[in-house]
């Protein structure tokens, strides 16, 4: 009697391997497109249609709406091929799983800090793309898992319990799917804002579990090359948090708990390298590198308010009761620093306006000082910093800022809660009366929520006291009104200098949206940073 050997797997067992390689190739082309778009597309789009401007600006800016549509069109067009969709449901469910795993390599690549392979991007540029690609991967993984659960439940020839729980590789996939669903839940904005630490911890654990447990779950295997590539990216992630890290203690901390104003924190100069760009960020962890929590819990980002030539590293922050506080006498770990301002702006701008709110001064001030330096004297034609603050006491953080020698630099401070009884101040600062609020800034979310006059118990206006400021730093104070973009920046834009005109904004989404609209209307360059989770 002859013995017949039957194949362990069906004829479609290896059918998804070529599609995995195709996805990897598309991912590589995707990275090349990101690099090429940033290098070849100019910052400003002129003499083009509305849609052409949007497409080019989105391509240069790494817009998730544009790039993810392009990516998934390229991936889904050949998704159903050779085998019918209804006849081979299991094959295409497996293909979804392989697609999500291969794209994880691209997603991890986008999170590298610093990413030397993506020149021209500052590290904040690609966060929206990473966020939406992560959600897409979770969705693909969930459809893959739920699809198989439904398939087994409807198939009378198989045991659902045996397939889902007794088959160990399938059980591993079930664990991954449950974790993906939990990650999606925690990524919803209200939940994420309620407990960012929980979101971050789950995010980190989920990434590692997804990479290594899926490698055990997947059939045919994905260890070579995908798991190896992902493991290599994890190694780089660990090295980037350990090799440049350095321990520090606070030099000093100046705060006013009574008035709840901005806090000035001074770190030793070694907290930053010898050379760094103005407006750079650093990330601080309360844990040492030997503590596992150093890698599992989020570090805290701060914008450096200092310049490389300063003797200390200064931070300007607004501390909240429930937030993270830097305290004197404790040790902290500086993980790394990252540039946040486009180099083209720092190198070639000739007309610069900086608009910031509250602690956003830490972003704008070093950029302002950079352009007010003697080295930029012949280059800069217009330089103005507009700082929007809630209370007059916030201005005290400027007490140790040295004077500026620039002949074109202007510093305007809008104090929104205190209105003087007249237009005179003994210090000689110029005061503007309250004016009609510009509708473009009506939705500011953080510092500017209160514009009421300060009144005493008899209803009289309280006269503001101007803190002492270094000479040459502030050119005017404005009490009790918002910024009117068109009026207060009336001398900013010159048609012959549009290519080298930069508007720099830092604050909540409302402020940055207003800045974006102003930049679009005037066809100038924009660099902005939003302070939000």
UniProtKB/Swiss-Prot annotation:
Q: Which domain of life is it from?
A: Eukaryota
Q: Which leading EC class covers this enzyme?
A: oxidoreductase
- GO MF annotation terms: ferric-chelate reductase activity
Q: Where is the signal peptide?
A: none
Which EC numbers does the record give?
A: 1.16.1.-
InterPro entries for the chain: FAD-bd_8, Fe3_Rdtase_TM_dom, Fe_red_NAD-bd_6, FNR_nucleotide-bd, RBOH/FRE
Q: How does it sit in the membrane?
A: Multi-pass membrane protein
- What does the UniProt keyword field contain? Electron transport, FAD, Flavoprotein, Ion transport, Membrane, NADP, Oxidoreductase, Transmembrane, Transmembrane helix, Transport
The residues that cross the membrane are 17-37, 61-81, 102-122, 136-156, 168-188, 198-218, 220-240
Entries under Gene3D superfamilies matching the protein: Nucleotide-binding domain of ferredoxin-NADP reductase (FNR) module
List the CDD domains: NOX_Duox_like_FAD_NADP
Domain Ferric oxidoreductase: start-end pairs: 96-213
Any GO BP: reductive iron assimilation
* UniProt GO cellular component terms: plasma membrane
Q: Which residues form the FAD-binding FR-type domain?
A: 240-366
List localization entries: Membrane
Pfam families named in the record: FAD_binding_8, Ferric_reduct, NAD_binding_6
Primary location group: membrane
Tell me, in a sentence or two, what this protein's role is.
Probable cell surface metalloreductase. May be involved in iron or copper homeostasis.
Q: Say which family it is in.
A: Belongs to the ferric reductase (FRE) family. AIM14 subfamily.
Write down what this protein is called: Probable metalloreductase AIM14
- Organism name: Lachancea thermotolerans (strain ATCC 56472 / CBS 6340 / NRRL Y-8284) (Yeast)
């Amino acid at each position: 009697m002859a013995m017949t050997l039957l194949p362990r797997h069906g004829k479609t067992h290896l059918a998804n391997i070529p599609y995995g390689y195709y996805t990897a190739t598309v991912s590589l082309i995707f990275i090349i497109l990101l690099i090429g778009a940033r290098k070849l597309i100019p910052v400003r789009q002129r003499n083009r249609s509305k849609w052409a401007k949007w497409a080019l600006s989105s391509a240069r800016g790494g817009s998730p709406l544009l790039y993810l549509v392009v990516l998934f069109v390229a991936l889904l067009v050949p998704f159903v091929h050779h085998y019918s969709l209804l006849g081979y449901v299991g094959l295409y469910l497996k293909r979804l799983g392989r697609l999500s795993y291969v794209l994880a390599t691209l997603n991890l690549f986008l999170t590298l800090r610093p990413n030397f392979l993506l020149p021209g991007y500052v590290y904040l540029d690609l966060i929206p793309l990473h966020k939406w690609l992560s959600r897409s991967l979770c969705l693909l993984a969930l459809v893959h898992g739920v699809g198989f659960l439904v398939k087994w439940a409807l198939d009378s020839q198989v045991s659902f319990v045996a397939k889902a729980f007794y088959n160990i590789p399938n059980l591993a996939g079930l664990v991954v799917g449950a974790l993906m669903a939990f990650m999606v839940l925690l990524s919803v904005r209200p939940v994420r804002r309620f407990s960012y630490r929980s979101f971050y911890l789950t995010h980190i654990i989920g990434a590692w579990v997804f990479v290594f447990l899926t490698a055990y779950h997947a059939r045919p295997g994905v260890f070579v090359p995908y798991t190896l590539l992902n493991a290599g990216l994890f190694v780089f992630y660990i090295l980037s948090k350990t090799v440049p890290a350095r321990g520090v203690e606070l030099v000093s901390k100046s705060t006013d708990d009574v008035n709840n104003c901005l806090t000035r924190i001074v770190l030793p100069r070694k907290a930053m390298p010898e050379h760094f760009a103005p407006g750079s960020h650093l990330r601080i962890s309360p844990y040492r590198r030997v503590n596992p929590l150093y890698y599992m819990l989020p570090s805290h980002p701060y914008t450096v308010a200092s310049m490389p030539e300063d003797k200390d590293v200064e931070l300007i922050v607004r501390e909240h009761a429930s937030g993270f506080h830097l305290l004197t006498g404790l040790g902290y770990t500086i993980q790394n620093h990252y540039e946040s301002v486009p180099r083209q702006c720092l190198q070639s701008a000739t007309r610069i306006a900086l608009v910031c709110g509250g602690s956003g001064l830490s972003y704008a001030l070093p950029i302002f000082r950079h352009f007010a330096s003697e080295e930029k004297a012949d280059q800069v034609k217009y330089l103005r910093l507009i700082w929007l603050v809630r209370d007059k006491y916030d201005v005290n953080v400027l007490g140790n800022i040295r004077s500026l020698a620039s002949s074109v630099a202007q510093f305007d401070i809008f104090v929104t809660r205190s209105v003087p009884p007249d237009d005179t101040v003994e210090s000689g600062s110029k005061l503007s009366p309250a004016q009609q609020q510009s509708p473009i800034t009506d939705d500011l979310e953080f510092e500017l929520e209160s514009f009421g006059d300060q009144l005493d118990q008899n209803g009289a206006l309280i006269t503001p006291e101007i803190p002492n400021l270094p000479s040459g730093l502030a050119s005017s104070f404005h009490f009790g009104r918002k910024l009117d973009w068109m009026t207060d920046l009336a001398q900013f834009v010159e048609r012959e200098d549009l290519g080298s005109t930069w508007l720099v904004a830092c604050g909540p989404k409302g402020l940055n949206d207003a800045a974006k609209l102003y930049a679009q209307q005037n066809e100038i360059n924009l660099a902005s940073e939003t302070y939000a989770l």
